[in-house]
A protein has these predicted regions:
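N-terminal beta1-alpha1 cap of cysteine-dependent amidohydrolase-like domains
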Residues: 1-96, 100-110, 115, 124-132, ...
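Amide-donor transfer/coupling interface in amidating biosynthetic enzymes
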Residues: 37-45, 83-85, 89, 118-272
Length: 272
């Protein structure tokens, strides 16, 4: 598949607010990206017209009940069959921030045994509580399975911003060690919060900005085709988005977020 043939659906609902930036990141790299309200796809669209699906950040449905749950339930009810086909065909799905919450609520992540009928994890209220909007460091822990990071060297440190009030990744306490081991054994652990030298936060604030278990910032499914992360790569696409650009004498054209978009595009271009 040629780069210009890749067609990305950036799906939004009421409360989504990062759709334009996400589409622009794909456009910058020569890919077709269309922002579609979920109702447009229900009435006149075909999800299978797209090579890839993205759930961007925001506060879908006002984060009522809990973040992502209403969008996930609505999606399952209205487009459940199309989603099933999309997943079964191995087409990539990306969830950023609220999008990650949607994928977890839908049962697509972690997806130890495929799509789960109920959430296997949660992204809950930050600890300490409060909305966190700041730049953080991530370490790529994935060994190559995740299609969104397998062009990024294992151990590489990325600088990307967060903006969320409910980003604390947790497993059920009685199963957390077992589930963590499953993530590691199946190469489903992707990003962990760390300091600028790559040293794990070990739960310490502010390096771990939300109290996430095992400093988890992003995971993928067993096939590596579905990826969710709390940080916003679309907000680290260009040099001028970085907070300290005015104090530097030299800046590269792009930020670290570009690496994630480049990785999935590279993988899609290798498909027939």
């Amino acid at each position: 598949m040629k780069t210009e043939e890749i067609k990305v659906c950036v799906m939004r609902a009421g409360g989504t607010n990062c759709d334009a930036e996400t589409a622009r990141a794909f456009h910058e790299l020569g890919v077709q990206a269309e922002v579609k309200h979920v109702n447009e796809l229900v009435k006149n669209g075909n999800l299978l017209d797209y090579s890839m699906l993205v759930f961007p950040g925001g506060f879908s449905f006002g984060d009522y009940v809990r973040s992502g749950v209403i969008f996930a339930r609505s999606l399952s009810a209205k487009l459940g069959k199309s989603m099933e086909w999309f997943v079964d065909e191995g087409r990539p799905i990306l969830g950023i921030c609220n999008g990650f919450q949607i994928l977890v609520e839908y049962g697509l992540l972690p997806g130890f045994e495929g799509t789960s009928p109920y959430p296997e994890a949660t992204l809950t209220t930050n600890e300490p509580q409060g909305f966190k909007c700041e730049w953080i460091y991530l370490k790529n822990e994935n060994r190559g399975k995740c299609l969104f990071t397998n062009k990024i060297p294992e151990g590489k440190i990325l600088k990307i911003p967060i903006a969320h009030g409910e980003g604390r990744f947790l497993f059920p306490v009685e199963k957390e060690q077992q589930m963590l081991q499953q993530l590691i054994d199946n190469d489903m652990l992707v990003f962990r919060y760390c300091d600028e030298n790559g040293v794990a936060a070990n739960g310490a604030y502010p390096t771990n900005p939300n109290g996430a278990f095992h400093d988890i910032a992003g995971i993928c499914n067993k096939e590596g085709t579905i990826f969710g992360l709390m940080p916003h790569p679309e907000r680290a696409m260009y040099w001028w988005q970085e907070p300290d650009w005015t104090s530097k004498t030299h800046m590269t054209q792009y930020g670290d977020g570009k690496l994630i978009f480049e990785s999935i595009i590279s993988n899609l271009t290798q498909k027939q």
